[in-house]
């Protein structure tokens, strides 16, 4: 999951459309480049085709508003790559992740009531694996580049304590371990 410069695109990507508008007012994200067909293709690359084909596809306009490019039916919302970040980062997320992102935007602990799934099958880059609010890497640090992955949130982040927090551990790892924003990153390969 990417929390970085241009993070608002990713954050808003997983919000249910009603919450996206509220979050979009908080901080405008850069608009994705390309025509509508290219943006839809980019957004759909975030998730398995059976999810992406029925997902809402949306983007953030240059003025920070959510624009639906295609209505969906399965409760997932996909957003295209943010061209202003160091790695491809389209995202496709369910409504539980929307709750997580709403809480993150408000800097409040998320009140997750069910398991949530988000896909980033093109990968992502993150400012930090430990600080949920870092917008750029700390001095002397690099972006944490994560290959294709699925993200999982659970109602109680302590349920993830058995997993390592090292993104180079070779398997699932916890991002933001020890915080209310902890979630499991599951590499696709």
Locations of regions flagged by a protein language model:
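Hydrophobic h-region of N-terminal signal peptides that target proteins for export
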Residues: 11-19
């Amino acid at each position: 999951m990417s929390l970085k410069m241009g993070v608002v695109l990713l954050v808003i990507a997983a919000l249910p459309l009603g919450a996206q508008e509220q979050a979009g007012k908080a901080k405008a994200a850069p608009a994705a480049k390309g025509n509508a067909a290219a943006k839809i293709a980019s957004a759909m690359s975030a998730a398995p085709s059976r999810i992406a084909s029925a997902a809402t596809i949306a983007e953030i306009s240059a003025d920070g508003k959510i624009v639906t490019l295609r209505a969906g039916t399965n409760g997932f919302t996909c957003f295209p790559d943010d061209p202003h970040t160091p790695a491809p980062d389209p995202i496709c997320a369910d409504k539980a992740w929307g709750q997580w992102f709403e809480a993150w935007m408000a800097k409040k602990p998320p009140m997750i009531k069910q398991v949530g799934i988000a896909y980033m099958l093109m990968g992502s880059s993150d400012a930090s694996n430990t600080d949920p609010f870092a917008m750029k890497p700390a001095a002397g640090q690099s972006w944490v580049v994560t290959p294709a992955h699925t993200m999982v949130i659970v109602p109680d982040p302590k349920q993830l304590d058995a997993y390592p927090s090292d993104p180079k551990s070779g398997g699932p790892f916890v991002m933001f371990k020890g915080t209310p924003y902890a979630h499991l990153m599951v590499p696709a390969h």
